[in-house]
Amino acid sequence: MSLRFSRTRRAPRGFTLIELIVVMAIVALLTSIAAPRYFASLQKGRETALLSSLNTMRDAIDQFAADKGRYPDSLQELAQQRYIRELPEDPLTGSRDTWVELAPPSELQATGRLWDVRSGAAGRASDGRLFADW
């Protein structure tokens, strides 16, 4: 009697449930480590953009006051007089309408209604300061 061993190819098998669970756990662990850093870097980028916009507008206000001998009446006047190309978008609120325009202090005895500008965003920056105080 001869024994014949057949060499049949077995069909390729998929991953086991345990292997899939282990891979998903590793992916979840890596995501939980990376996601907070990603969102923190997005927030830091928005804060940097806010500082840049505020500095640009404040420089334009000062230049307007030096040229005209008075402060502008609004941010729109800065754009109309070409001291800024256009009113920037507040990176924290995503709107051009949330800028807070501050009038000159009474002790300056200055004309014009726009002395400083701040963000209208609520909350605190990553360093703990209020956005309203920037």
Where do the PLM segments sit?
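N-terminal single-pass transmembrane signal-anchor helix
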Residues: 11-36
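Generic leucine side-chain signal with a strong bias for well-ordered alpha-helical environments
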Residues: 17-20, 30, 50, 54, ...
